[in-house]
Structure formats: C-alpha cells, structure tokens
Swiss-Prot record:
The UniProt record lists the keyword Transport: no
Keyword terms of this UniProt record: Amidation, Calcium-activated potassium channel impairing toxin, Disulfide bond, Ion channel impairing toxin, Neurotoxin, Potassium channel impairing toxin, Secreted, Toxin, Voltage-gated potassium channel impairing toxin
Disulfide bonds, paired cysteine numbers: 7-29, 13-34, 17-36
GO MF terms, alphabetically ordered: ion channel inhibitor activity; potassium channel regulator activity; toxin activity
Function: Blocks voltage-gated potassium channels (mKv1.1/KCNA1 (Kd>25 nM), rKv1.2/KCNA2 (Kd=2 nM), mKv1.3/KCNA3 (Kd=1 nM), hKv1.5/KCNA5 (Kd>25 nM) and mKv3.1/KCNC1 (Kd>25 nM)) and calcium-activated potassium channels (KCa1.1/KCNMA1 and KCa3.1/KCNN4, Kd>25 nM).
Family note: Belongs to the short scorpion toxin superfamily. Potassium channel inhibitor family. Alpha-KTx 02 subfamily.
Alphabetical list of Gene3D superfamilies matching this protein: Knottin, scorpion toxin-like
Domain comment, as recorded: Has the structural arrangement of an alpha-helix connected to a beta-sheet by disulfide bonds (CSalpha/beta).
Annotated site location: Aromatic residue of the functional dyad: 37
Modified-residue entries (Asparagine amide), positions: 39
GO CC term, one of those recorded: extracellular region
The protein, known as: Potassium channel toxin alpha-KTx 2.1
InterPro entries: Scorpion_toxin-like_sf (IPR036574), Scorpion_toxinS_K_inh (IPR001947)
Length: 39
C-alpha cells in the first residue's frame, strides 16, 4: 500500500507503516513515497 509520506530512504517509512499497519508491517521507499506491506 502506498501512503502519502515522502521519503528518501526506507527508514523514514518504517514508523508510519508500523503505526498504520502494526508492528510487523514492512516498509519501502518507492518513487519518493512510502510503500507499506504486510509480511
């Protein structure tokens, strides 16, 4: 799921993804936006 959070690295996406989808959520930075996924 791509969320409306700007990023330059996956580390910036980890916290918002975990807040939205729970502590097991993964995070990537794609095209300047965060992408969250459940493993």
């Amino acid at each position: 799921t791509i969320i409306n959070v700007k990023c330059t690295s996956p580390k910036q996406c980890s916290k918002p993804c975990k807040e939205l989808y729970g502590s097991s959520a993964g995070a990537k930075c794609m095209n300047g936006k965060c992408k969250c996924y459940n493993n």
